[in-house]
From Swiss-Prot:
Coiled coil: none annotated. PANTHER family: LETM1 DOMAIN-CONTAINING PROTEIN LETM2, MITOCHONDRIAL (PTHR14009:SF7), LEUCINE ZIPPER-EF-HAND CONTAINING TRANSMEMBRANE PROTEIN (PTHR14009). The gene is Letm2. It comes from Mus musculus. InterPro entries: LETM1-like_RBD, LETM1/MDM38-like, LETM2_N. Keywords: Membrane, Mitochondrion, Mitochondrion inner membrane, Transit peptide, Transmembrane, Transmembrane helix. This is LETM1 domain-containing protein LETM2, mitochondrial.
Length: 480
């Protein structure tokens, strides 16, 4: 009877429920859920598993037979009951297979790839801009050179600046002649980058950047400094060999060279005085090969060939320099720009970097005075330029001995706080200031008996302590 009433109660309960209800079958298997279909004649439960087959189990309705499922589920059911945390029981992990994370590229990888692409693209763009600017400047120079040639054909005189520009553009145009071979021969234009890598000086001067120019000038300047030291040593050695002829002049020359090496600026009078001693010995005909090579490096010339070829090369360059000196003397040194001053000093074997405009003008005027007015031989002129090619480092500022160095603590010392007085000062001078009390002072100890702290013996220390205790006891008795 009780069992029948229980079944009838369940039947009424299921008929009143909505179309279908889903609840988890067991807390230990949260991924499983029972599906109950309302039917008065059929009470079966169907297990719903995520992505698995569906099996029917008899419900507790009292029916002994299990009827097969003839109805098709209209849709897949999903429950979130397995996500709820049951208190007192550990929450199990989801039995379903975790989805593989899609391989999405991170932001850093994206930025790296974009930077690489940009850098490669930027390199190509920079190279194209570089060649475009070089060819555009070359085209402008050729147009200006054509106008200069037209003026020259009509009998007009050229200035130094126009003449140098015409020579430079002609040299740049002739540098492009070897590239015609690469254009004429088929498939040979692919070797142009290799050719430029092996011979970078084959490009015209308009393709040379300022940074490359500065690096090249620094390298040549370092080489010239070493050459100047070598030439100074040769001059001192020649003076030592000819001590009998020169006499005191050899010692004066050696001392003068030492002064110049320490930073003394040579004057034109001193150079003329010492150049008269080497008129015959320092001629180009009497110079050896190492000296000729050093002079060629000083003028930035090639050092290949025999001694006669080097002498001829030096003579031709010195003649062109003399003609240039005459033009500069006519136009004036002040008419030159800074770049022109640097190039003129560099062509004459003088320093061109690390100097102001005034210093460059002084160097060039000194060269003109020696070459045109004093008629100094060209070889002696070049050797005299070695005195200007000395790497002088700035000396530290030295104070005279009378002036004392300022002390760091210049402020007025502030009196210490009272707490520090009690701890650090002696109590004897404080007690001397009291009016109603008198104390016996210790007799002064002669200075001859005072020994340093390191040599005082233990006995003397004990005697001094005993005297202090006796005096303190007497003072206490008098006070009482």
């Amino acid at each position: 009877m009780a069992f029948y009433s229980y079944n009838s109660f369940l039947a009424i309960f299921w008929t009143r429920l909505p179309g279908h209800s889903v609840y988890p079958s067991c807390s230990h298997f949260p991924s499983l859920a029972f599906l109950h279909l309302p039917d008065s004649h059929l009470r079966t439960a169907y297990i719903k598993n995520c992505g698995s087959r569906k099996y029917s189990y008899p419900s507790l309705t009292g029916n002994n037979k299990v009827h097969p499922l003839r109805t098709r589920l209209p849709q897949k059911l999903h429950t979130t009951c397995w996500l709820q945390h049951v208190p007192g029981k550990p929450q199990l992990e989801q039995t379903g297979k975790p989805k593989a994370a899609s391989p999405q590229p991170t932001k850093e990888a994206k930025t790296e790839t974009t930077e690489e692409k940009r850098s490669l693209r930027q390199k190509i763009v920079n190279e194209l801009k570089y060649y475009y600017k070089g060819f555009s400047l070359l085209w402008i120079d050729t147009k200006v050179a054509a106008r200069i040639v037209w003026r020259l054909l009509h009998g007009n005189a050229l200035t130094r600046r126009e003449r140098r520009r015409l020579l430079r553009t002609c040299a740049d145009v002739f540098r492009l002649v070897p590239f015609m071979v690469f254009i004429i021969v088929p498939f040979m234009e692919f070797l142009i980058p290799v050719f430029l890598k092996l011979f970078p000086d084959m490009l015209p001067s308009t393709f040379e950047s300022e940074s490359k120019k500065e690096e090249k000038q620094k390298k040549t300047m370092a080489a010239k400094l070493e050459i100047a030291k070598f030439l100074q040593e040769t001059m001192t050695e020649m003076a030592r060999r000819n001590r009998a002829k020169l006499g005191d002049a050899s010692s004066q020359l050696s001392s003068y060279v030492k002064q110049v090496q320490t930073g003394h600026k040579p004057s034109t009078k001193e150079i003329v005085r010492f150049s008269k001693l080497f008129k015959d010995q320092l001629a180009l005909e009497h110079l050896d090969r190492p000296q000729l090579v050093a002079l060629c490096k000083l003028l930035e010339l090639q050092t290949f060939g025999t001694n006669n070829l080097l002498r001829f090369q030096l003579l031709m360059t010195l003649k062109s320099i003399k003609a240039d000196d005459e033009i500069i003397a006519k136009e004036g040194v002040k008419a030159l720009s800074v770049s022109e001053l640097q190039s003129a000093c560099r062509a004459r074997g003088m320093r061109s970097l690390g100097l102001t405009e005034e210093q460059l003008c002084q160097q060039l005027t000194g060269w003109l005075d020696l070459h045109l007015k004093e008629n100094v031989p060209p070889s002696l002129l070049l050797l005299s330029r070695t005195f200007y090619l000395i790497d002088v480092k700035p000396k530290p500022i030295e104070l005279p001995p009378n002036i004392e160095t300022p002390k760091p603590n210049l402020g007025i010392p502030t009196p210490p706080p009272p707490e520090s007085k009690e701890n650090l000062t002696d109590s004897a001078p404080q007690l001397k200031g009291t009016k109603d009390e008198e104390f016996i002072q210790l007799p002064p100890v002669p200075s001859s008996l005072i020994a340093p702290a390191a040599t005082i013996s233990k006995e003397a220390i004990l005697q001094a302590k005993s005297q202090e205790t006796s005096q303190n006891s007497k003072a206490d008795s008098k006070g009482a």
